[in-house]
Amino acid sequence: MDKFRVQGPTTLQGEVTISGAKNAALPILFAALLAEEPVEIQNVPKLKDVDTSMKLLSQLGAKVERNGSVHIDASQVNVFCAPYDLVKTMRASIWALGPLVARFGQGQVSLPGGCTIGARPVDLHITGLEQLGATIKLEEGYVKASVEGRLKGAHIVMDKVSVGATVTIMCAATLAEGTTIIENAAREPEIVDTANFLVTLGAKIAGQGTDRITIEGVERLGGGVYRVLPDRIETGTFLVAAAISRGKILCRNAQPDTLDAVLAKLRDAGADIEVGEDWISLDMHGKRPKAVNVRTAPHPAFPTDMQAQFTLLNLVAEGTGFITETVFENRFMHVPELSRMGARAEIESNTVICHGVETLSGAQVMATDLRASASLVLAGCIAEGTTIVDRIYHIDRGYERIEDKLRALGANIERVKGE
């Protein structure tokens, strides 16, 4: 397994070009199954999960090519089952189910690896499709959906806010007979992006970005060209990198209006921030950040995917800061690893109390999930000495060439090939 070796401390400064958003690219790739004509999707990040999704679409009979953009022609799709060997590495494959049953009247997706119904919100995808008239069976580890004729529009009130299930219901409803209303819908920018992609293909959707989305079903979707929005979490991660190293950065190909809550907290921490239409700059003027209090919640509140990075910011900031996680359980696995580097923190139920220290020391640490691992790499950039970050396959799932981008900002980081 590959590792990162990071030598610190360094002040990170310079420019970085932000990649397309993984969390919009994946649902958009699967939504392309609804189109009867070719689509071109631009600004798709080069990531493991994207490659897996493209493989899966090919196995279903779509023609998939990548040359800068991703080109998908789903006119010849003739296989309606997403097999376990591809699904096991990636939960996003559940997004194949809605488009398959909506367009072809049938679809099967292997249950995502080690996923028990109820514990993870696959059940919300299922109840949503059932409300649109699909019959769902769970057999031999597969979710099997079918419908006689077309799906039927419905008024769906979601039990809890779920990005994944909002995508599934919205995609399926585009080809349903009649009107579908989704109440308590997720409001994330990636939902808006997926809806806008569907509209480009001829779908009739209104209210995306609010908690009430209305979809008027159409008979077919055509082709089109669409550009995926910039990755707000990658943008936030690089802004934090500059803030904790007392540096300055310019993020290009960014979308500032998707990051209001994060930018507000960075300003509270003492960062000087400017924004343009497609760029964000941050300058610490050589100062140490101040501790901030953060509470995660669904969009437009502070994103859970920026929690680990802000935990790190607080651990090297002036003062004491509180970070409360309300979205996911067990999302503080980076804290004990950062403690190995000299960070001072206590976890009390779903809150981390961070006592800022002046410096961290390099250590051997282990990545546990995507965002936690990014925070460990950033910690290595500012720690005294050498940090080895193990299990970095987590990072490769969500950050495109993070080491190259950090190196361009002055980080001393290398990928070490594992046994």
Swiss-Prot record:
* Residues involved in phosphoenolpyruvate binding: K22, N23
Q: Which UniProt keywords apply?
A: Cell cycle, Cell division, Cell shape, Cell wall biogenesis/degradation, Cytoplasm, Peptidoglycan synthesis, Pyruvate, Transferase
GO BP of this protein = cell division; cell wall organization; peptidoglycan biosynthetic process; regulation of cell shape; UDP-N-acetylgalactosamine biosynthetic process
Q: What is this protein called?
A: UDP-N-acetylglucosamine 1-carboxyvinyltransferase
Task: Give the family per the record.
Answer: Belongs to the EPSP synthase family. MurA subfamily.
Q: Which Pfam families match?
A: EPSP_synthase (PF00275)
Q: Where in the cell is it found?
A: Cytoplasm
Could you read off the lineage of the organism from its UniProt record?
A: Bacteria, Pseudomonadati, Pseudomonadota, Gammaproteobacteria, Enterobacterales
GO cellular component terms given for this protein? cytoplasm
Question: Which reaction(s) does the protein catalyse, per the Swiss-Prot or TrEMBL entry?
Answer: phosphoenolpyruvate + UDP-N-acetyl-alpha-D-glucosamine = UDP-N-acetyl-3-O-(1-carboxyvinyl)-alpha-D-glucosamine + phosphate
- Chief subcellular site? cytoplasm
List of residues that carry 2-(S-cysteinyl)pyruvic acid O-phosphothioketal:
C115
What is its pathway? Cell wall biogenesis; peptidoglycan biosynthesis
